[in-house]
Curated annotation (Swiss-Prot):
Protein name: Cysteine--tRNA ligase
Compartments, record wording: Cytoplasm
Catalytic activity of the protein: tRNA(Cys) + L-cysteine + ATP = L-cysteinyl-tRNA(Cys) + AMP + diphosphate
Cofactor note: Binds 1 zinc ion per subunit.
Family: Belongs to the class-I aminoacyl-tRNA synthetase family.
Amino acid sequence: MTLRIYDTAARKKRVFEPQDAKRVTLYVCGPTVYNYAHIGNARPPVVFDVLRRVLMARYGEDAIVYARNITDIEDKIIAASVASGEPISAITQKYAAIYNADVEALNVIAPTIEPWATGHVPEMIEIIEKLIRKKYAYVGDTGVWFSVPSMPDYGRLSGRKPEDNEAGARVAVDEDKRDPSDFALWKFAKPGEPEDAIWDSPWGRGRPGWHIECSAMAAKHLGRTIDIHGGGVDLTFPHHENEIAQSECAHGEELARYWMHNGFLDMGGEKMSKSLGNVVTVHDLLKAWPGEVLRFALLTAHYRAQLDWTEDLLKQAKTTLDRIYGALRRVWEADGGEARDTGVLRALEDDLGTPDALAELARLASEANTAADLKDAVAMANGRANLLAAGKLLGLLTKTPKEWEQGADTDENSRIDAQVQARVDARVAKDWAEADRIRKALAEEGVEIMDGPAGSTWRRI
């Protein structure tokens, strides 16, 4: 089956055909690192991680070059530095490390390349100089501006006109502009701004605009035309529209051949955002839930659809994963099976149809249970192989059944192991009262003991 993805620019699904099947390029806008990421911020890395896994299955792991940037200079970062008294680099390094650890806990594979904006200021200046020479940009009193009217087809990605811009979309009002829709390529430094937010340039000291950062990083690491550019739907306009304007006017080549955008997460019927104050951070969620539960929950809705984030969604995701891991446990020792071409890949090849892929994963778990009921060794081995292959595509089932059932607290697990062994010893000694006491005590802690031919094991319930 061919891979079909919804291209925002074309407003329809298109068959994906890379420029070079041996080097498939993917660029996704990464975090602005000044605070903890909320769970809505985690949707793009999870969605595009699934896309990356599908691409790896089709073209090979080494063929996929995936860049996800770090925005480490921006107005909110500067404000955080001024408020805290910490250097900008201390803030950005701290929160970039936390972000990467958080998304790693969601089974997101690290990007091939993680460019930081501040490491690419010379490349940004080079693009701006080219835009000025080609009359697409001009120097004003407060900065260097891109002239939106100079690009006749500006707005083709989003289908929006410059005057359609809405509040909060990061297009600043400034009397220095020739046109209200013009946007900043370079911002001149203001009195009192921290020195670590200022660079020299041919036009004066200052810092780059937000949009030019991605244009420079994508071109340097992936080339002037990339296969797929992704991000949240809120970036479609103006950020991605402005990236197109800068890059294509500077280089005279198409920036991206396919554009993909994921939908919002809602909480209480409103878009989740820091400005609305209705956010829950990934960092906090990971204290209460396994990362795989968060990932599963994020995949329950199609990536372009809005997803209502609730406690019930997390509970349902945990229950479903418990059942799937339970099936995997029953066939875990059955090695040597062959994974067949299941419906998981077919679902994902149709514009990342994760709801259908998860339904197929559940069906594979039922097959594995049936094979275990029948004690069919070949079917059990194949069931194990099918589950693990499907899990690899989705970024799920990355733990052993025992690890999943017992959690990750090693010290606590050792204590429970000792209690279970004490119960085994009590049963051998026919001290039934002690054995029953231990079982009840563990049950009160949410631990279930399972006795079988191979001995006694336990799981959290």
